[in-house]
Amino acid sequence: MSEFELLAQDLLEKAEAEEQLRQENDKKLLGQVLEIYDQKYVAELLRKVGKNEWSRETLNRWINGKCSPKTLTLAEEELLRKMLPEAPAHHPDYAFRFIDLFAGIGGIRKGFETIGGQCVFTSEWNKEAVRTYKANWFNDAQEHTFNLDIREVTLSDKPEVPENDAYAYINEHVPDHDVLLAGFPCQPFSLAGVSKKNSLGRAHGFECEAQGTLFFDVARIIRAKKPAIFVLENVKNLKSHDKGKTFKVIMDTLDELGYEVADAAEMGKNDPKVIDGKHFLPQHRERIVLVGFRRDLNIHQGFTLRDISRFYPEQRPSFGELLEPVVDSKYILTPKLWEYLYNYAKKHAAKGNGFGFGLVNPENKESIARTLSARYHKDGSEILIDRGWDMATGETDFANEENQAHRPRRLTPRECARLMGFEKVDGRPFRIPVSDTQSYRQFGNSVVVPVFEAVAKLLEPYILKAVNADSCKVERI
């Protein structure tokens, strides 16, 4: 072969290798996007930036390897990249590492990422919540692990596995981290596991008392990985759940694990561990926050959640400011549903009960909504937006046509995102890739984001102190 023929062959082989690599990267990129958005929606968008005849079927065949490899155009590639979340501004220079357990849609994560943290592990079982999480939070494939079932990591559903083996497995599969975040579910502690382990001569302590609950999984990870700091979140009723037994087991466990819990002795009406979201946004939403410091680091002195008031906004947004100017009519209650809720509230009011809808006047700058719940998708009754319904006319002539035009409406998912603090009215939109029903569940199960942004700011100097203390220990070793 001549010199140029050899060159041509070499260039061809190089081009084919580059093309193959690009096709593999394009397929990987598409796969990441399809973990969040449905195929039909993505195909529609791709058709708008090029001449390729994309469809749900062509995407499905490509991603499943049932057709010849494809190469995206530059416009198509850019579109798909824009559909994924951007890395935080401080990437890749992170100040500390954290993990996000029972993550939901990332409400606790945001504050800790904002102060310079890197999320290296996320666990969330609900696949629809995972879609929303992945739509909004950057997850570096090289540094981050996603888990759908925490029990697969802790082996808590395999009682036959010896404890030492379980801890070794956790240590291998959960990345090292400085801060552990967890919004675990509230569950009663059963004595069944205790008696079984006693009969087997197994260890006492939290390994017995907390078995069978998802808090047990959190405790196992804390014991195995020994993070410097943890932040646990739960409903306010955790303190009184099961006549206080649940909370006692949790606090005893955290003490057994070697942690000082901030404000642990405070249990009364003004317990600083119970934080109401109304201080940050116009929604009454009380949550208990447990902040723990590893005892051997001796860094907990001076920390109290009472100081969170330092981060209250000077001017809390009013309820009306969070609303969209124009919404789809589907969010207005139907005459039948409004009549049902109206009569239901009247019936219980007559009995002296407080059950009923929560009507919020958006014109009143002091209005505070009730707690948004995961069942909001059913009827929206806990937070209804007043659209000018005349109560007096409603009492005498409920079917009055003019008054019926002012039936209340429920919040839109976008307004829920604002009420929970996932987005600001003039800020970057929070991406909602799921149905209204799913989004209502997700926001109703979440936390008021600014509360945990404030907790993160309060903790920032302690986290940096912990990182420094841990690194000094490693150097001495």
Curated annotation (Swiss-Prot):
Matching Gene3D superfamilies: 1.10.260.140, 3.90.120.30, Vaccinia Virus protein VP39
Top-level taxon: Bacteria
Record carries keyword Isomerase: no
Keywords: DNA-binding, Methyltransferase, Plasmid, Restriction system, S-adenosyl-L-methionine, Transferase
Keyword Transcription in record: no
Descriptive protein name: Type II methyltransferase M.EcoRII
Organism listed in the record: Escherichia coli
Gene (name only): ecoRIIM
Database matches in PANTHER family: CYTOSINE-SPECIFIC METHYLTRANSFERASE, DNA (CYTOSINE-5)-METHYLTRANSFERASE 1
Pfam family, one: DNA_meth_N
Reactions that this protein is recorded to catalyse: a 2'-deoxycytidine in DNA + S-adenosyl-L-methionine = a 5-methyl-2'-deoxycytidine in DNA + S-adenosyl-L-homocysteine + H(+)
SUPFAM superfamilies: S-adenosyl-L-methionine-dependent methyltransferases
Subunit and interaction comment: Monomer.
